[in-house]
UniProtKB/Swiss-Prot annotation:
Name of the featured protein: Sodium channel protein 1 brain
Function comment: Mediates the voltage-dependent sodium ion permeability of excitable membranes. Assuming opened or closed conformations in response to the voltage difference across the membrane, the protein forms a sodium-selective channel through which Na(+) ions may pass in accordance with their electrochemical gradient.
Organism: Heterololigo bleekeri (Spear squid)
One Gene Ontology cellular component annotation held by this UniProt entry: voltage-gated sodium channel complex
Glycosylation site list: N248, N258, N942, N963, N1124
UniProt intramembrane stretches: 279-303, 576-596, 977-998, 1271-1293
Matching Pfam families: Ion_trans
Gene Ontology molecular functions: voltage-gated sodium channel activity
SUPFAM superfamilies xrefs: Voltage-gated potassium channels
I repeats (start-end): 41-342
């Protein structure tokens, strides 16, 4: 018995201690009567307690739940089985009720949340049975209640050890998401309202055939016209049956001849679901845009129906919504989970990093031996009984072992094995569809040879290492591959056993034994899988629950009659497999299209599945990815991993050293001297992927060289690189700002000729050098650089005019030609000037100047070719295309962008290293895909490209016999190259639905595909998505983010903070915030009585609450606005808008009256005034030009958008949202530079795309609006492709080849045919290179740079909040400061300091008595006895952080940088004359008091000659407080 908390609540409890897995598990129960019947010692209750705490009971329940989950996955569940499961769960509940009680006392049944879940599910089951018993007809109506049975799967979370703690921590961590979710909903509302105002009804515009003829007898013309436009046969439709959208605004999609664009025709696109007609549908579309799922469809439709300017709306949603909000959610989830795990004190926080490090170190420690140790312990590899059994044969056997040992551990053998592995991989990759018989035989013989080599290697290893062979995981993996290869050879001629061929692909993993990066990556993946085991189980359970829920709700709804005669969609809920794949697809981010199909079948119920799966699934997915990125982050990739003995021996390696691949040593085999040797070798062979780049002065890569200059190996902070002194990286010109100019010629030239060596000393040489110095001054002049930058921009803009219509505009073409010549001459002149000023050595050894030289030469050659009429020659066309690189010259002259580019370029080696490993991983899936699908994606289609059913055409021969076409899919697995392209589409989730559809329909080569003939091939893609995309692709992204963040710090001047201690870093991060705020003047209460009353009103909390209520009410009214609303609704909303506008205007007026000129000091007030002004203008414009006759209706819609700005005012009262938005605000400078880089890259690709693909025939996804024909259309297309949206659809038409195009001629807009190279056909190699490189550079690299900056600032803001000094604390400081310094002089008197720091709120508050603290602050006191606010704040921050700041060199340099920055921000502080300090004054005060006491004693001694009287007086006299 245990009396717990008896002093507080007298709750008596008892505990049962159970031994489980060698641990004592404590179960606590209430000691009161359970169910008011059973005492703790009652036999029945004791039996119940015994059963409830028994591990076998948990196992039985777990087994029951598993079986129940299997039954739940069946569409038709046996009622008898349901009764059995319900009985078991009821029995469990009864046992727990008897053992612990119901709910009154602590530790009873319902006091546990998991038991509440069990109780709820059981009660719902009984209610379902009761309703079914009462009336069998209501069975269909209680399907929703029966669906709750799937929640039983959650019971596994409370049964499986460890999962319960994981889920509890996860639920507590989700609390931090509240602010993010509110911000997302807030922004979603704003985007939705903007969508209603801008695009309401726009997607109903259609091209209608013009009326010909007259109405029939008895019909009016209006009736005839109405019937004509309502007849869908008169609407212009595409080949897929979708109607063509159009618009009447400038730049919108036009209608062809004989068609007219009319509004409000038919329903909206996608079965009426894609529209902005009301706030509900607009919220759905905005959520689709936020998640970037098939958003290119909405993008294309809106631009076509409205105007190209709507791209601004989509850019804002993509950059702010998708890139910031969604990734902020990722950061918050990962951070919150990490914090909760730390708070629980569990070991879960070590699973993502510590486990990997310990595993690698342990493996390295166990698996490395020196030669002497191996020789001395060679006998230990054999069993102890071998010598006794073998007798005289034992010594010869040892010699054979030693011989095999020397062979297998020889460096030549290792190189040979590596060569064989690489060669084997190449031969595996050579397999493709349509191979010749000779190549098949070569590959077959090669497989025999490779298998023989690997078998011999395994035999030699077994001979050499005996029992030690099986102590290495790599050796076991090798043996499995060898055995599988032998089985593959044995069953080579049989069908259906090709699975053994897949094991040959595992030979690629041999490379991991010699390739350190790949080996490290494999170890990371294996350890991460283990550490994320519980989370993976939770993810599977969530998928299972939603899959079963969808199965129970919708499995009878997907019928052909619901889809207007179309076949049932491939993605449905008809069985558990399809439901599982549907939920998996939603988790991968594809939810909108299957939800459209679901809504066609079941209407609104689909929201119950798709939205929760998307939101909750995204949360879990973000947590999963966050932990993966944590495991794959820099701390792992840059781990100082000792290069194992797999690698080639170094200079000190011995030829017969035992390698880990050959032998695993035990701890006893390693001697101390061997350990020292291993440790020494490891120190010499450490690798670091962060700092392996030798760089030039301007930050560009010259070569890669793995060395020991690793940041992680710096033992102290004593030697810090001098490259960063608070400034950025020097550009090419400023790096030469020296007293002496650079040599003009290389040393090997000038040293050979005496005249050149002595030239500088001659009078001509001095004149020449002076001339070069003058040129240097010209080149370094800021006006010269500005002029060059302007010329670069002007010449780049000129490239935008060279579209396919340029030949139809001869004057413009001639003007562009002459301008090109002018710019070319200017660039050539600049090049000559810099070449003379900098010298040949410097000019041709720096990246940016070499780039300038290359672009100038390309321009000269291109112009020469144009002048000679040879521009159509392929070589010159390619050079002309390279002129698109011209904007890159601006990078070296834009310092902010140059920092970004330098950081990016220096990240390339590490990115390439990891990317190469990822390619090897993908190679395995690519080769497997070739083996599974090569030649099987062919199909028989008709003239409309529709696949013929297999019942009509069975194979290729029948297809040709019936005059159909036998075609292959554009993306296929016929060879490894095509497989890589297909896998890239799957990894980016673009076009993967079509690829999977082709894969699961395959039968055999040259046979017609059949619908889901091999449905189990879905799992091939599931495995690739998990390992190839979730793991491997996110590893690349993680390296990009980490490397960019590190190098950006290095080059923007914040590099030194990496050398600071945690306390110093917190102090430094706080200092960076201090410069953002200054004291403000206090708004005094007016003396005029009327103004004073108004002032009191506007400053009261009740007034703010009233205004907030008005704003929320206004937003509710705005939500009722929709397209085609009734006149009554229109009038009510118009009246309400006028009323709200008047209220806002009155608010602004009374605030101006009360606050006077101080009203404009607050930016929120300025924003309010702007919104009020625009709202008043909107009301007047709507009243005067409501019919739109004198004003474009689009302008009215834009004016109405400003009403949405009223809701933004709520942010100033939302503390959580302000913090999240603050992280964005402080990121803006870096984001601006990244955005500029993004625009630069997009501009370059726009010029290249316009030049290379502008003449391609329009087909497929390319149409009159989406194409590469003009700069504007190309740029709009690349904005969409920046998010990888539908890039596969664009790639398809770019691959067009004859006979679908003309390889010799193009057709102009006038119908004229012009002969050009390649005609209107595509160039597949160029199209694939262009598209894939653009996706990699923009989507995977530049976008992740954007994310890296935001996440870094969020993590910094969160870490600063954990420290305790936040923006609100600084606001509080200056708020109190205003009371002591109403005129904002930035100074207060020394006498006020004690009261001031007493009035502050924690953590900056220092309670009285605080005189000692003030003295220790050592604050400078200027003339007049004043102290500056910044000095006080710096001291308080240091005091709040603990005050223990070690004065290291790095910290001193950082503080010097910040002091220089503060001097710029607070000039009055710098100019003030310091007279003393608080510490000095304290010392002077103490000295004065000491003198006073001494003088007092002296006077006493003189007044009282008796010693007793003196002693009595001193003791009895009161002491002055010190």
């Amino acid at each position: 018995m245990d009396e717990k908390y008896t002093a507080k609540n007298r709750d008596k409890t008892f505990v049962v201690i159970e031994k489980r897995f060698k641990k004592n598990i404590i179960h606590r129960f209430s000691a009161k009567r359970s169910l008011f019947l059973f005492t703790p010692r009652n036999p029945i209750r004791r039996l119940a307690v015994c059963i409830a705490t028994n591990v076998c009971f948990d196992y039985f329940l777990m087994f029951t739940i598993m079986i129940n989950c299997v039954f739940l996955a069946m569409p038709d569940i046996s009622e008898f089985a349901e009764y059995i499961f319900l009985g078991i769960y009821t029995m469990e509940m009864a046992i727990k009720l008897v053992a612990g009680g119901f709910f009154i006392d602590k530790y009873t049944y319902l006091r546990d949340a998991w038991n509440c879940l069990d109780f709820t599910v059981i009660m719902i089951s009984y209610i379902t049975l009761l309703l079914q018993t009462i009336n069998d007809k209501v069975i269909s109506d209680i399907t929703g209640l029966r669906t709750f049975r799937v929640l039983r799967a959650l019971r596994t979370l409370s049964i499986i050890p460890g999962l319960k703690t994981m889920v509890n921590a996860l639920l507590r961590a989700l609390r931090m998401l509240i602010s993010v979710l509110i911000l997302i909903l807030f922004c979603l509302w704003i985007f939705s309202q903007a969508g209603v105002q801008l695009f309401g009804g726009a997607l109903r515009h259609k091209c209608v055939l013009q009326i010909h003829g007259s109405p029939a007898f008895g019909k009016t013309y209006d009736e005839f016209y109405a019937e004509h436009i309502e007849n869908s046969d008169n609407w212009l439709a595409k080949g897929n049956g979708e109607y063509v959208l159009c618009g009447n605004a400038t730049g919108a999609g036009p209608c062809p001849t004989n068609y007219t664009c009319l509004p409000d025709i038919g329903e909206n696109p996608n079965y009426g679901y894609t529209n902005f007609d009301s706030i509900g549908w607009s919220m759905l579309i905005s959520f689709q845009l936020l998640t970037q799922d098939y958003w290119e469809d909405v993008y294309n439709k809106v631009i076509r129906a409205h105007s190209p300017w709507t791209v601004i709306y989509f850019i804002v949603i993509n950059f702010f919504g998708s890139l910031y909000l969604m990734n902020l959610m990722l950061a918050v989830v990962a951070t919150a989970y990490e914090l909760e795990v730390k708070n629980t004190g569990k070991k879960l926080q070590q699973t993502a990093a510590t486990a990997r490090e310990q595993s690698l170190k342990e493996q390295e420690r166990r698996n490395t031996l020196t030669v002497s140790e191996a020789d001395s312990h060679v006998d230990d590899r054999n069993c102890t009984c071998c010598e006794q059994c073998c007798g005289c044969c034992y010594n010869p056997w040892l010699r054979v072992q030693s011989f095999a040992h020397c062979i297998i551990t020889d460096s030549f053998t290792e190189v040979f094995i590596i060569f064989i592995i690489v060669l084997n991989t190449v031969f595996l990759a050579m397999e493709h569809h349509g191979m010749s018989m000779e190549l098949k035989n070569v590959l077959k013989v090669a497989n025999y040879v490779f298998t023989t080599v690997f078998v011999l290697e395994a035999i030699l290893k077994l001979l050499a290492f005996n029992k030690q062979y099986f102590k290495s995981g790599w050796n076991i993996c090798d043996l499995v591959v060898v055995v599988a290869s032998l089985i593959d050879l044995g069953v080579e001629g049989l069908k259906g056993v090709s699975v053994f061929r897949s094991f040959r692909l595992l030979r690629v993993f041999h490379l991991a034994q010699s390739w350190t990066t790949m080996r490290l990556l494999l170890c990371i993946i294996l350890n991460t899988l283990g550490s994320l085991g519980y989370l993976t189980i939770i993810l599977i359970i969530v998928i299972y629950i939603f899959a079963v829920t969808g199965l129970q709700l919708f499995h009878t709804e997907y019928t052909p009659d619901k889809f207007r005669g179309e076949p049932v969609p491939r993605w449905n809920f008809n069985d558990f497999l399809h439901s599982f794949m549907m939920v998996f697809r939603i988790l991968c981010g594809e939810w909108i299209e299957p939800m459209y199909d679901c809504m066609r079948a079941c209407n609104g119920l689909c929201f119950l599945i798709f939205i929760p799966v998307t939101v909750f699934g995204k949360t879990l997915f973000f947590l999963f990815i966050g932990l993966v990125l944590g495991a794959f982050g820099s701390d792992t990739v840059e781990q100082e991993v000792e290069v194992s003995s797999f690698a080639l021996p170094g200079p000190e390696s011995k030829p017969c050293s035992v390698r880990e691949r050959g032998i695993s040593a035990t701890d006893d085999n390693v001697k101390d001297d061997g350990q020292d040797e291993v440790q020494q070798n490891s120190e010499e062979t450490k690798i670091d992927l962060r700092n392996n780049d030798k760089q030039s002065k301007d930050g560009m890569i010259l070569e890669n060289n793995c060395n020991n200059d690793s940041l992680a190996s710096l033992g102290s902070l004593g030697s810090i690189p001098d490259i960063m002194d608070g400034s950025s990286v020097e550009d090419d010109i400023s790096s030469c700002q020296q007293k002496d100019i650079q040599p003009c010629l290389p040393l090997f030239i000038s040293s050979r000729f005496k005249c050149l060596r002595e030239f500088d000393d001659t009078s001509h040489g001095k004149k020449w050098n002076n001339f070069r110095r003058q040129l240097m001054m010209v080149c370094e002049n800021k006006y010269f650089e500005t002029g060059v930058l302007v010329i670069i921009f002007a010449s780049s803009i000129l490239l935008a005019f060279e579209d396919i219509y340029l030949n139809e505009k001869p004057r413009l073409k001639l003007a562009i030609f002459y301008l090109d010549i002018t710019f070319c001459l200017l660039f050539f002149l600049e090049m000559v000037l810099k070449l003379v000023a900098l010298g040949f050595v410097h000019y041709y050894t720096h990246f940016w100047t070499i780039l300038d030289f290359t672009i100038v030469i390309i321009t000269v050659i291109s112009l020469a070719a144009s002048g000679l009429g040879m521009e159509q020659i392929t070589a010159f066309r390619s050079l002309r295309t390279l002129r698109a690189l011209r904007p890159l010259r601006a990078v070296s002259r834009w310092q902010g962008m140059k920092i970004i580019v330098n950081a990016l370029m220096l990240s390339i080696p590490s990115i390439f290293n990891v990317l190469l490993v990822c390619v090897v991983f993908w190679l395995i899936f690519a080769i497997m895909g070739v083996q599974l699908f090569a030649g099987k994606f062919y199909k028989c289609v008709n003239e409309t490209n529709m696949r013929i059913p297999p019942t009509e055409v069975a194979n290729k021969i029948e297809c040709y016999n019936k005059n159909y076409t036998w075609v292959n899919s554009n993306v296929n697995f016929d060879n490894v190259g095509g497989a890589f392209l297909a896998l890239f589409q799957v990894a980016t989730f673009e076009g993967w639905m079509e690829i999977m559809a082709d894969a699961v329909d395959v039968t055999e080569v040259d046979e017609q595909p059949k619908f889901e003939a091999t449905v189990y091939y879905y799992f091939y893609f599931v495995l690739f998505i998990i390992f190839g995309s979730f793991f491997v692709l996110n590893l690349v992204i993680g390296v990009i983010i980490d490397k960019f963040s590190f190098l950006k710090k290095k080059y923007d001047g914040t590099y030194l903070d990496m050398f600071l201690t945690p306390t110093q870093q917190n102090y430094y991060n706080t200092l960076k915030k201090l410069g953002t705020k200054k004291p403000q003047k206090t708004v005094k209460r007016p003396k005029n009585k009327c103004q004073a009353v108004v002032y009191d009103l506007v400053m009261s909390n009740q007034f703010e609450i009233f205004i907030t209520t008005i704003i929320i009410t206004n937003m509710i009214f705005m939500a009722f606005e929709h397209y085609n609303q009734s006149e009554v609704v229109t009038e009510v909303l118009a009246t309400a808008n006028i009323a709200f506008t008047i209220l806002y205007a009155v608010e602004a007026i009374i605030k101006i009256i009360g606050l006077r000129i101080h009203y404009l000091r607050n930016l929120w007030n300025v924003f309010d005034f702007l919104v009020v002004t625009l709202s008043v203008m909107d009301a007047f414009l709507n009243d005067i030009f409501g019919d739109g006759i004198f004003m474009n209706p689009s302008l009215l819609r834009v004016a109405r958008m400003f009403r949405i700005g009223r809701i933004i005012r709520l942010i100033k009262w939302a503390k959580g949202m302000r913090k999240l938005l603050f992280a964005l605000v402080i990121s803006l400078p870096a984001l601006f530079n990244i955005g500029a880089l993004l625009m630069l890259v997009m501009f370059i690709y726009t010029i290249i795309g316009m030049s290379s693909f502008g003449q391609i025939k329009l087909s497929g996804a390319l149409n009159d609006q989406v194409n590469f024909q003009t700069f504007g259309k190309t740029f709009l297309l690349l904005v969409r492709l920046a998010t990888s949206a539908g890039w596969n659809d664009i790639l398809g038409p770019l691959l067009i080849q004859p006979p679908n195009c003309d390889p010799n001629y193009i057709t102009t807009s006038t119908g004229e045919k012009i002969k050009v190279v390649n005609g209107d056909c595509g160039m597949p190699w160029l199209a694939i290179s262009y598209m894939v490189s653009y996706i990699i550079i923009v989507f995977m690299i530049v976008f992740n740079m954007y994310i890296a900056v935001i996440l870094e600032n969020f993590n910094q803001a969160h870490a600063q909040e954990e420290v305790g000094i936040t923006e609100d604390d600084l606001d509080m400081f200056y708020g109190v400061w205003e009371q002591y310094d109403p005129l904002a002089t930035q100074f207060i008197k020394h006498e006020q300091l004690s009261d001031f720091i007493q009035d502050l709120d924690p953590p900056l508050k220092v309670k009285k008595p605080n005189n000692v603290a003030i003295a220790t602050f050592d604050l400078p006191i200027v003339k007049g006895g004043h102290i500056h606010c910044l000095d006080i704040l710096l001291a308080l921050v240091k005091f709040a952080l603990g005050g223990n700041l070690e004065e290291t060199e790095a910290f001193k340099r950082v503080r010097t940088q910040m002091e220089a920055r503060f001097d710029e921000i607070f000039p009055t502080r710098e100019k003030s004359e310091i007279r003393t300090s608080t510490l000095q004054m304290r010392r002077e005060e103490m000295a004065a008091r000491t003198l006073q006491r001494a003088w007092k004693r002296r006077k006493i001694m003189r007044s009282f000659p008796s010693p007793e009287m003196i002693r009595y007086f001193i003791i009895s006299a009161p002491e002055t407080a010190v």
